[in-house]
């Protein structure tokens, strides 16, 4: 039996992908076979497809670090055939064939049952970027950061940044979004940003050891000087959630 997958092959330092027929693996103890309904496209998937070192462990390889689907075979009592599930992170799309194929064969402890409030496509609409944004925002919420001051988001047109803007706005924060893309101003406002800060203007003044406390919290997806400046502008007992490579 075979399934179709987007297989990346390497030849003399060149990496190329195509849809190929791949053998369905025999179910191993402690693992499950999942029929993939949806995946999502992440930066790490592009790295794997282009042969970036430290991502895929070997080639040929199927990328796709996010999976939403249903169990078609299980070797563990934790899952039954027909269960709707999600898998993300761990080594999916790195040392294990990922979600850009019809079937994945994963350790059962990498898999969770899909919440009944969601469906496969909704889960993958958020994907790894959404999970990362949610983890950042949970730290802000757990820190009981005041809503009297705005929150700051860097990299706001990227996956994590844009979802952070939307969630923070939805839960009642005033959101200031840093962006270098003037063409995306209307999109950011639509997602909930109250103020757009041009990245070059934001960085135009020298970074001080301590600046005026302007924000109760921040989500940073960029690092470097942007993060350095951000840290000087956070009020006492504030939270800065950082993520990225």
Region roles according to the model:
Residues 23-41, 52-92, 98:
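Glycine-rich beta-strand-centered segment in the early N-terminal region that forms part
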Residues 74, 94, 177-187, 224-226:
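Short glycine/proline-centered loop/turn elements that form peptide/ligand docking sites
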Residues 78-79, 145, 234:
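Short, well-ordered loop/turn sites that connect or cap secondary structure elements
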Residues 84, 150, 238-239:
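Short glycine-centered segments of the SAM/dcSAM-binding site in methyltransferase folds
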Residues 86, 216-219, 241:
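N-terminal Rossmann-like NAD(P) cofactor-binding module of classical short-chain dehydrogenase/reductase
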Residues 124-201:
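Mid-domain Rossmann-like dinucleotide-binding core that forms the NAD(H)/NADP(H) cofactor-binding site
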Residues 202-213:
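Short amphipathic alpha-helix with an adjacent loop that forms part of the alpha/beta core around
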Residues 222-245:
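Glycine-rich phosphate-binding loop and adjacent beta-alpha segment
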């Amino acid at each position: 039996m075979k399934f179709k997958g987007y297989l990346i092959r390497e030849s003399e330092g060149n990496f190329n992908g195509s849809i190929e027929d791949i053998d369905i693996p025999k179910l191993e103890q402690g693992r499950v076979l999942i029929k993939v309904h949806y995946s999502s496209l992440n930066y790490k998937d592009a790295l794997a497809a282009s042969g970036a070192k430290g991502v895929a462990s070997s080639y040929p390889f199927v990328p796709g670090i996010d999976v939403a689907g249903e169990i078609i075979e299980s070797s563990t009592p934790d899952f039954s055939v027909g269960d709707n599930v999600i898998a993300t992170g761990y080594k999916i799309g790195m040392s294990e064939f990922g979600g850009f194929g019809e079937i994945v064969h994963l350790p059962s402890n990498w898999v969770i049952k899909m919440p009944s409030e969601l469906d496969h496509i909704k889960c993958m609409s958020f994907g790894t970027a959404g999970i990362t944004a949610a983890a950042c925002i949970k730290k802000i919420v757990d820190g009981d950061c005041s809503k009297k001051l705005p929150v700051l988001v860097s990299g706001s047109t990227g996956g994590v940044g844009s979802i952070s803007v939307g969630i923070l706005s939805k839960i009642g924060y005033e959101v200031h979004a840093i962006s270098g893309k003037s063409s995306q101003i209307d999109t950011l406002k639509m997602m909930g940003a109250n103020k757009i800060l041009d990245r070059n203007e934001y960085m135009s003044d020298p970074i001080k050891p301590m600046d005026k406390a302007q924000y109760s919290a921040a989500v940073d997806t960029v690092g470097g000087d942007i993060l350095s400046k951000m840290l000087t502008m956070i009020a006492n007992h504030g939270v800065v959630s950082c993520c990225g490579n």
